Regions:
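Short, surface-exposed, charge-dense and proline/glycine-enriched linear segments
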Residues: 84-86, 93, 147-153, 175
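Membrane helix-loop-helix hairpins that form the core translocation module of multi-pass transporters
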Residues: 136-148
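Active-site glycine-rich loop that binds ribose-phosphate moieties when present
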Residues: 147-169, 197-198
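Internal active-site segments that recognize and position negatively charged phosphoryl groups
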Residues: 160-191
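Active-site-proximal beta-strand elements of phosphoester/diester hydrolases
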Residues: 142-144, 169-171, 234
């Protein structure tokens, strides 16, 4: 196998990953190995796999991507793979999980220290360790995610195989692709948040070539002044 003999399990707000350090750049996993390790019945189990390595050791990066990391002083790279073995731009929860792992390995700074500059396929992310925060929990990080972009409002149809109904979804680029579907409104015929089947992979049409995350959102309250609402979210990782 092209993975080390010791790997670890990490999570951020329940989004869990198999992680390992590859300082020498000798353990780039195959898609089959990622699927095996992330299998929840026969492997370790996880939403994805993260290899912490140097940008030069990631075979799918081009010279420009490596140069961006170097210019932004990102010596370490988050080589993130989805549980199905496919490559992914990055994962917001994953950036925190792998930075905590980097702390434990003596690579990233401790709380109050210098921010950790982490290379990803979506550019360099900067994480600041805040330590334990009473109102937020243990091992809290502030992440500079960069700019985001929204596509056409309600430009996609979201369905769940085996579940009647559909909802309209809006594309949001957070460095990795998301489609956000508002349910329990006039344009959705899907069940309520509590009744949604989040085990089955949602279908997004028209199809997005890179695949995407899907978020289902219910608007509970909306202020007349600022158009900001409080929402409950059920997340399906795709």
């Amino acid at each position: 196998m092209s993975i080390p003999s010791i790997v670890y399990k990490a999570h951020a707000t329940g989004n869990d990953f198999v992680v390992y350090l590859d300082a020498e750049g000798t353990y780039e996993p195959t898609a089959d190995e990622v699927r095996f390790l992330c299998d929840r019945h026969f492997g370790i189990g996880g939403d994805g796999l993260i290899r912490l390595t140097h940008p030069q050791a990631v075979s799918d990066l081009n010279d420009k991507q490596i140069a961006v990391c170097a210019a932004d002083n990102a010596d370490w790279f988050m080589d993130y793979r989805n549980a199905d073995g496919s490559l992914a731009e990055m994962c917001g929860n994953g950036t925190r999980a792998i930075t905590l792992f980097a702390q434990r390995q003596g690579i990233a700074g401790q709380p109050g220290g210098e921010p950790f500059r982490l290379g990803t396929r979506a550019g360099v992310k900067v994480l600041t360790s805040l330590g334990d925060v009473p109102t937020l929990g243990k091992d809290v990080f502030q992440v500079e995610m960069g700019s985001w972009k929204r596509g056409d409002l309600d430009g996609y149809e979201v369905t769940i195989p085996g579940t009647a109904g559909s909802a309209r979804g809006t594309f949001v680029d957070m460095g990795n692709p998301h489609v956000v579907a508002v349910i329990e409104d006039a344009f959705s015929s899907l069940p309520t948040v509590e009744q949604l089947d989040l085990v089955t992979k949602p279908v997004v049409a028209p199809r997005i070539e890179s695949d995407q995350n899907v978020e289902f959102v219910r608007i509970d309250e909306q202020s007349e002044g600022d158009n900001e609402g409080n929402a409950k979210i059920g997340r399906a990782h795709v």
